Each structure stands twice: as structure tokens, then as C-alpha cells.
């Protein structure tokens, strides 16, 4: 499979069922978020989830993975950070881990070159029976490459943009949603500081939905902000609680 060596690819499903064309939404499992997206992530969309460490961005992506697999559709999960946890997947699967795992295909690139190879062939990998693609995180290996390659940030940024274009095209052609997660960096203004996704302009340009996962004073409660995009005219704020079983809606009232 391109330049990805076999030891970096863990395939736990070889079920070719062409059902993806009938799938329109992949729910997150969080009612507030799903209602704000009319049921979940739409087929044909590229979606960005970003936030600091421990804000549930990977958990949200894995919940979508579980919900897709339980519909009998395969998920391509590209684990760029090497943090995919079968134990965490089991916790989110509500006693149906074997059923879920059967439909999860895991690819684990070890550097930005291998991530590029995955992006180049992503349409081939998802040709039949897939309902979702997750890339977690799309900026980890990019950030590492920028740090080690002096003076080549522009070229790497352009390559990341090309990867996002490939993923967006795959999503539209295959009519399935794609989710990318991103690390963040600090943005310091005159009155307050905030965070933004790494390679902000590239990621936000391609994203149909953008969800910012923000910590609160209660470390178990996360503020999920669905940001304005060309396809979303109003910002929506939801609160979710991080539990062992996943992210759940919570009320602050």
C-alpha cells in the first residue's frame, strides 16, 4: 500500500459491502452537538475538531467511529500520533467491542512522509464499504517535521493543504464524512489569550464543520463550540462531560 509498510497497518476488517452511498449522517452520540448538525456529520463533508490535550477531541472522533461501525460500515482510522487505544475503543463500545472492532481499519504513519502517502491514496483505501474516515491528529507529524526542517515551513504547509484537498475530494466522491483532529497553539491578544488549531488557515479553509473543544473550571466538563463557517451561520455552544464510557451531554443549570 504505497510507501506504508505492512507493520504500520493493522487491518481488522476485510468486509466489502457497498452501503456507504446510503449513509447520510454519522452521529457523535452527544445530543446537543448532533441536533446542531441535524443528526451528525454529513456524508461528503470534511470536519475539524481541535483543542488542547485532554479536552476530548480524540474521544469524540472515536465515538463517531463506534457509531459508524455499529451501522455495519467500515471506518478508516489514521492514527498519526500513535495514541489509538483499543482499551478506550472498548470502553466506548458499550459491550459491543468485537462487533465494532470488526469494522475498524487502523493505519499508523510514523512520519509526515508516510502521512502524505496515506493522503495520496485515501480514495483507494476507502473505495468500498466505508462510512467514515478519521485522521487523529492531522497536525502532529506536520508539526514535528516543521520543527526539524529549518526554512521549509512554507513547503510543508503547502503539502498539508494538498493533503486536506485530497481528503475533501475523497469525502465528496465517496459521499462519506471525514473527521480530522488538530493540536493547538497559543494566540495572545491585547486583552486575553486563546488557542487556535495548528495551520489554522489551511484546516479552517477546508472544514465544513469546526468544533472547538475547550476546557472549563471543572476538568470533567468540556465546552464544545461549533464555530461559524460558510455552511454554518450561527455559533453553537454545547457542554459535555468526559466519562469512562465517553462524552455525554450535561446541563450547567
What are these regions (language model features)?
Residues 1-77:
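Detector for small/aliphatic-rich hydrophobic stretches
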Residues 170-253:
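Phosphate-binding/switch region of NTP-binding enzymes
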Amino acid at each position: 500500500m504505497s510507501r506504508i509498510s505492512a507493520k504500520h497497518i493493522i487491518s481488522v476488517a476485510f468486509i466489502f459491502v457497498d452501503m456507504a452511498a446510503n449513509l447520510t449522517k454519522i452521529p457523535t452520540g452527544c445530543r446537543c452537538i448532533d441536533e446542531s448538525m441535524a443528526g451528525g456529520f454529513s456524508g461528503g463533508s470534511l470536519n475539524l475538531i481541535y483543542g488542547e490535550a485532554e479536552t476530548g477531541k480524540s474521544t469524540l472522533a472515536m465515538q463517531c467511529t463506534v457509531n459508524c461501525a455499529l451501522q455495519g460500515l467500515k471506518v478508516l482510522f489514521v492514527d498519526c500520533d500513535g495514541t489509538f487505544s483499543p482499551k478506550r475503543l472498548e470502553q466506548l463500545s458499550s459491550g459491543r467491542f468485537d462487533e465494532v472492532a470488526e469494522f475498524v481499519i487502523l493505519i499508523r504513519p510514523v512520519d509526515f512522509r508516510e502521512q502524505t502517502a496515506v493522503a495520496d491514496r485515501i480514495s483507494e483505501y476507502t473505495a468500498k464499504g466505508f462510512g467514515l474516515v478519521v485522521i487523529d491528529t492531522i497536525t502532529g507529524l506536520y508539526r514535528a517535521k516543521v520543527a526539524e526542517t529549518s526554512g521549509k515551513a512554507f513547503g510543508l504547509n503547502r503539502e498539508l493543504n494538498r493533503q486536506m484537498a485530497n481528503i475533501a475530494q475523497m469525502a465528496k466522491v465517496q459521499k462519506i464524512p471525514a473527521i480530522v483532529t488538530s493540536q493547538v497553539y497559543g494566540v495572545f491578544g491585547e486583552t486575553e489569550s486563546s488557542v487556535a488549531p495548528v495551520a489554522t488557515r489551511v484546516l479552517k479553509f477546508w472544514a465544513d464543520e469546526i468544533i472547538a473543544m475547550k476546557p472549563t473550571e471543572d476538568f470533567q466538563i468540556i465546552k464544545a463550540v461549533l464555530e461559524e463557517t460558510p455552511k454554518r451561520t450561527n455559533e453553537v455552544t454545547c457542554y459535555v462531560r468526559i466519562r469512562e464510557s465517553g462524552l455525554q451531554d450535561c446541563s450547567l443549570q
